[in-house]
Amino acid sequence: MKASQFFISTLKEAPADAEIVSHKLMMRAGMIKKLGAGIYNYMPIGLRVIRKVENIVREEMNRAGAVELSMPVIQPAELWQETGRWDKMGPELLRLKDRHERDFAVQPTSEEVVTDIARSEIRSYKQLPVNFYQIQTKFRDERRPRFGIMRGREFTMKDAYSFDRDTDGLRKSYENMYDAYVRIFRRFGLEFRAVAADNGAIGGSGSHEFHVIADTGEDAIVYCPTSDYAANMEAAEALPLLASRAAPAEDLVKTATPEKAKCEHVAEFLGIPLQRTVKSIVLAKDTEAGAEIWLLLIRGDHELNEVKASKVPGLADFRFATENEIVDAFGSPPGYLGPIGAKKPVKVVADRTVANMSDFVCGANYRDYHYTGVNWGRDLPEPVVADLRNVVAGDASPDGQGTLEICRGIEVGHVFMLGTRYSESMNATFLDENGKTQPMQMGCYGIGVTRILGAAIEQNFDERGIIWPAAIAPFAVVICPVGYDRSEAVKAEADRIHAELLAAGVDVILDDRGERPGVMFADWELIGVPHRVVVGDRGLKEGKVEYQGRRDAQATAVSVADVVGHVRSQLAN
């Protein structure tokens, strides 16, 4: 391809509303153009990268035995009402009515539609297992779309759905997709981690997220460098930091702590380590009889993990209590709360570490006062115990193989064991060998195709622009002839190299725009093409051209006769 036959539209400066690196560089490189909030046109450069991502995904899905289909973007509300997600999903599900006042949804995922296909088409165990996938447009009406395509409203996603006869089959399908995802991300050329995760709104019994590692990632990835343990922050298990509880050594004392409402300020005022304080977090669970009030206790230097809290029996769909509810239950404003002496019945749950603490400090349920020397069993009943906190770097790994470290990542893929979450609610069944009706066991597997672009850039860039991994670069090689429109020798040699690389199956573009060298180099470094060949009169007089990899600090002189072979060897590496 020649640049004069393509469309290149780069910018020297990023738009003012571009916040993160990938958004800025994609706009400057002319990959995307904003059409509306969270909605973008994918320009030719950007679309080439998307197609390369899609091709790798499609090849590996087919290799794994999945079957491609295409489901509608607009889906009837009745299917979503069957599973309850029509009401549960809230405003992020874009709803619309047709001219007959019938309700529809713009798909954010396709569990309902694919389950409808399965229940209509699959009758017998002989038709199982099967794995359907599509690469399709999705839409989520984000409250605050930002960060370019990283948190846009419209996006392209590969979603796959497996159907099996039993849990053993589901496990095999899940492992098959997990392995396919590992191959996909390796082929992308990205540093990534697969981590244990929470199932979230989709539901099910087990899941893993695939994260591209990047310092700018919005997700915390917890891992043990000396073992295979890895999880996202929501799912990472926090072991108790105290092996056992020490015997009480202090008396319970109600101590004045004037205007000290935060654990940090209380610890400083009392001259004790922050680790001896206990933080009180009040939650409410709405019931037909009214709001149940729960008090969760974590150590003063720790943070509540809301996903873990939601898994405490009886606390699903909790909310944070209002200040009025807090004062009504405890007789004290926030900042001075604790498990001793609440005005009304409160359910108390202690984090594992708090359950092993002795002589700790907590609120006294009285403004400007805290209790010191608090001990379980003596001063208050033994608590219900649960893992409630976020892990921190240096915690013991749950597998006993070392300590945990934390890095940042960008979620680009997710695999779920759904089980019968959708097949039972939608009556997707089959007949087994004995003629008995059984619900299908489902798995769900997603990859954010367009999100891959942003994540790859966040991991691979420098001050000059994008540095694409070779497998998903818009072009593998760019030829930059200096004086293409003025020198017959330069034109002839550039055309020859271009033709030979094309004949060898190399994805190459020849910049025949007649731009100055500085403009050409700046454009292609910004766009991020991995390999560059520069042809100029000065080098040709010595029988040389210049080769430079996008990550190389200096160009290398290569003989005209060897340049095609040299480029091909670099591509092979």
From Swiss-Prot:
The keyword ATP-binding applies. It comes from the Bacteria. InterPro entries: aa-tRNA-synt_IIb, aa-tRNA-synth_II, aa-tRNA-synth_II/BPL/LPL, Anticodon-bd, Anticodon-bd_dom_sf, Pro-tRNA-ligase_IIa, Pro-tRNA-synth_IIa_bac-type, Pro-tRNA-Synthase_IIa_type1. It is an enzyme of class 6 (ligase). One of its GO terms (cellular component) is cytosol. One of its GO terms (biological process) is prolyl-tRNA aminoacylation. It holds the Pfam family HGTP_anticodon. The keyword Ligase applies. It is found in: Cytoplasm. Belongs to the class-II aminoacyl-tRNA synthetase family. ProS type 1 subfamily. Catalyzes the attachment of proline to tRNA(Pro) in a two-step reaction: proline is first activated by ATP to form Pro-AMP and then transferred to the acceptor end of tRNA(Pro). As ProRS can inadvertently accommodate and process non-cognate amino acids such as alanine and cysteine, to avoid such errors it has two additional distinct editing activities against alanine. One activity is designated as 'pretransfer' editing and involves the tRNA(Pro)-independent hydrolysis of activated Ala-AMP. Consists of three domains: the N-terminal catalytic domain, the editing domain and the C-terminal anticodon-binding domain. This is Proline--tRNA ligase. The gene is proS.
